[in-house]
């Protein structure tokens, strides 16, 4: 994968997250902001999830209250380089915990 392909795929990931949060119908308030390639999700309780791209490594990084995760693209899924879990699984787990209600991005 070259740099432009990596950025295209990361942009697609950001857009999917943003669209799901724009359509969020849950009880808690969840905000999403993209600034300089960093996506920040802020929850009603003040906690945050930060997602950014690491161009030199072609990785997506996810920072949550539970910890930090690094994802490599394997096939068509972003997979954690430590646990083998998908980006979406870990994001949904963290967002659900931080929102206090079920949050789905799929």
UniProtKB/Swiss-Prot annotation:
One of its GO terms (biological process) is iron-sulfur cluster assembly. Keywords: Iron, Metal-binding. The keyword Cytoplasm does not apply. Belongs to the frataxin family. This is Iron-sulfur cluster assembly protein CyaY. Involved in iron-sulfur (Fe-S) cluster assembly. May act as a regulator of Fe-S biogenesis. It holds the Pfam family Frataxin_Cyay. The keyword Ribosomal protein does not apply. GO terms for cellular component: cytosol. InterPro entries: CyaY, Frataxin/CyaY, Frataxin/CyaY_sf, Frataxin_CS. It comes from the Bacteria. One of its GO terms (molecular function) is ferrous iron binding. The gene is cyaY.
